[in-house]
Amino acid sequence: AIDELKKLGLKTAIITSGISILAKYVAEILEIDYYLANELLFNEKDQLIPGGVVKVPLLDKEKILAIWVKNKGLKMSEIIYVGDSVFDVPVFKKVGFSIAWTCNPSLGKNASTYLCCDGLKCLVDYIRRLFSL
């Protein structure tokens, strides 16, 4: 499904307050172009160091995205952002178009639109329709 977005000339990215190991894995499987996530750190005995490196604080996604967008030579108004939680609401308000991927209308009202459907195909079909207008 992601290849359909690439055919439209879109770049894809994951921004998560989760861990980079998982974000990288998902990005590779889905052929996502970029990912931003928090890093795990290990000591010389390969033991996990508590805290790691926080690159995407849970409450600062919009700030991290804005920095990333600027570094890529883009504008926030050029971004289509898809989120599924209350922690995405600040980002919804800063980007050009936002999609809340949820069946919760109270969360959905914070985005440009919301989708209550399963699977990436539904999301990709919606974005493809946006570009055919």
Regions found by a protein language model. Name each.
Residues 1-133:
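C-terminal cap/substrate-recognition subdomain and adjoining C-terminal extension
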